[in-house]
Amino acid sequence: GIVFTNYNVEQIKKILEERISESFIENAVEDPALNLCAALAGGEHGDARRAIDLLRVAGELAERQQSDKVTIEHVREASLKIEENKEEASLKSYPLHEKLVLLAIMKANGSSTGEIYSSYKNLCKTVGKDGLTQRRVTQMLSEIELSGIISGRLIHQGIHGRTKKYKLTVSSEMIKKSFKDELTLQDII
């Protein structure tokens, strides 16, 4: 197998140039496109695999658009597409109750832990599942926050002490798209 080490941008460009000479006709990949592939991957601790992926997806996009060149725009589009696919894959991999919590946040965006919990309990009832305890759900919110899919901020509420409000950092479309194949959730998305 290929062992991927950390490369600098120049080395990544060399690797890409080899790939291009194997799989593209001459001059099909514009220089700025090649440079952006290398720069985007070089910034990510020199990941040659990421550069190769970017180039491949950019090439597919160019082909689909019947363009005879891979341009810097194709690379930008490819980069967004790869990010979206990563988000979708990580959302799909959550267990059911985490998904229910994410749907509760989606339905009550910008809500406090308490509001999210009651929204979650309602969703559990709708899909015929027993809800977890509020303490466990609060813990789950902190765990999901670490993944970057939701963001929370502490709000001070006078005599009631403080609560945390959470909102999604991904679009609700992305959540729906990622969960649509899960049978249990089909009625509530």
Model-predicted regions and their roles:
Residues 25-28, 43-49, 66, 88-92, ...:
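Short acidic, glycine/proline-enriched loop segments that cap or flank alpha-helices
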